[in-house]
Amino acid sequence: MEAKIVKVLDSSRCEDGFGKKRKRAASYAAYVTGVSCAKLQNVPPPNGQCQIPDKRRRLEGENKLSAYENRSGKALVRYYTYFKKTGIAKRVMMYENGEWNDLPEHVICAIQNELEEKSAAIEFKLCGHSFILDFLHMQRLDMETGAKTPLAWIDNAGKCFFPEIYESDERTNYCHHKCVEDPKQNAPHDIKLRLEIDVNGGETPRLNLEECSDESGDNMMDDVPLAQRSSNEHYDEATEDSCSRKLEAAVSKWDETDAIVVSGAKLTGSEVLDKDAVKKMFAVGTASLGHVPVLDVGRFSSEIAEARLALFQKQVEITKKHRGDANVRYAWLPAKREVLSAVMMQGLGVGGAFIRKSIYGVGIHLTAADCPYFSARYCDVDENGVRYMVLCRVIMGNMELLRGDKAQFFSGGEEYDNGVDDIESPKNYIVWNINMNTHIFPEFVVRFKLSNLPNAEGNLIAKRDNSGVTLEGPKDLPPQLESNQGARGSGSANSVGSSTTRPKSPWMPFPTLFAAISHKVAENDMLLINADYQQLRDKKMTRAEFVRKLRVIVGDDLLRSTITTLQNQPKSKEIPGSIRDHEEGAGGL
């Protein structure tokens, strides 16, 4: 059963009509999978002085109404499923002013019969006001004003059911910096966060979240240049130069014993790396690529980051309780500059930027701490040739061995949490979408530049005409894809931030490659490859995008062996020029 679990607070007296007033949490929405809850403390009846709180609050000199957004049909279906599966509600809560408060005990007693009958709508009175508990829509309806308030409950089996909560058009009173008067900053801003809190024993867990939802990005990260929301905006050269730092020694001089390589280490979730340790980890992991200039290492540092870390550590405890071992690891996540500032505020699900499909499935793809060069291939390149990688703590829990189902987007069973490519020595981790905001904590951002990066396919490189392939380089790396100008170009290719050259290996036409792999690839996969190739020829797909999809479908090992075999064969009859199309969107490897 899927259940919604958030901060639950017992009430001891009625100051606002539904329970003791507590420090307001941040504008977070919370929802997670079901966790069993033990019996909770009873709530004493309110005193006679309770009053219904005003629905409007004054913020920054203006009256703003806390908006509870319309739910989608999908959410209503989910709520209906909750209602069908739930037992008898033993504890009912309302979400007001940023916190959950209990429905008083005497009201629960008054509507006990309706609760036991599992009535979809129950009418009751409190402090002279009439309300309806709408369990199907998970809301409480004020019959006088029509105001709706989110509704949650805990049943007799200890299962918690919470809706999705949204708050917009307001700023928290706990901001520690003054928000600039700007139309963009004052625009409605929704924040949604997945969190999971286990409720057990007679204690009620408490978690205070303080946040400033400042879209300007101020105080979002310490020492990390914050990205603007629009991808059309660019870094200022002077700003970049002032932020950049050079490695004091070449990568080749780093001693591997000095680096902290934790891909196989079992962490408790409490270890904290410093920037120097992250530099060493990155340097050792990319040593096979040659000298990799690290421009900067920044830590996500803000009140929001601290709140997310607290949630992550709570999730570690929960996973450890249910699995025996949380199995926390460090892992690398490729990132785009324009979404970095939104990661802490909106989570890794922001715009779907981190969700990717591969031969292992659909989800958040990370690589082991000692294999950053694998993630580097998916890093976008900004206009200054800078790439970005995020070092994350990841709760892997019980790991599932993934067997190449590209359509898989959730675990293969309740006994698994996330997936890996190898149980004993994993290099690729997949965190399913349902866990992406609870099982991953982004901690550091590494800004770096690379020349002749194997398999790096940035957005700007994708605009070039042709791509070549060479098999030189580290043995464990896939073929190197290099950007170069086509026959119409000037003869030199200057991809952004690097000095790539023409391919060192002979040019390989796509049709020749397809013919060679056709008997080794499934028929459906070949149909997909041919369809993508047609889009490439029609200029509906960039070359870099096509090559990336080809590598995902076929696999780097098969491409490597096939290209090597074809290159070692005697030269055959010249391929017709109609096939060897040098226009953008065609050609070969």
From Swiss-Prot:
GO terms for biological process: defense response to bacterium; embryo development ending in seed dormancy; ethylene-activated signaling pathway; jasmonic acid mediated signaling pathway; lateral root morphogenesis; nitric oxide biosynthetic process; programmed cell death; regulation of reactive oxygen species metabolic process. Plants overexpressing RCD1 show a weak rcd1 mutant phenotype. Interacts with the transcription factors NAC013/NTL1 and NAC046. Interacts with dehydration-responsive DREB2 proteins and a number of transcription factors belonging to several protein families. Interacts with turnip crinkle virus (TCV) movement protein P8. Residues 571-589 have a biased composition (Basic and acidic residues). One of its GO terms (cellular component) is nucleus. GO terms for molecular function: NAD+ poly-ADP-ribosyltransferase activity. It comes from Arabidopsis thaliana. Residues 64-153 form the WWE domain. Residues 481-503 have a biased composition (Polar residues). Expressed in young developing tissues, such as young leaves and flowers and root tips. In mature plants, expressed in vasculature of leaves and roots, and guard cells. Residues 501-572 form the RST domain. Gene3D superfamilies: 3.90.228.10. Keywords: Developmental protein, Host-virus interaction, Nucleus, Stress response. Residues 464-504, 569-589 are annotated as: Disordered. Disruption phenotype: Small plants, altered leaf shape and early flowering. Plants lacking RCD1 show enhanced resistance to methyl viologen, tolerance to freezing and supplementary UV-B irradiation, reduced sensitivity to abscisic acid, ethylene and jasmonate, increased sensitivity to ozone and up-regulation of reactive oxygen species scavenging enzymes. InterPro entries: Poly(ADP-ribose)pol_cat_dom, RCD1/SRO1-5, RST, WWE_dom. The gene is RCD1. Induction: By ozone, salt stress and cadmium. This is Inactive poly [ADP-ribose] polymerase RCD1. Residues 248-469 form the PARP catalytic domain.
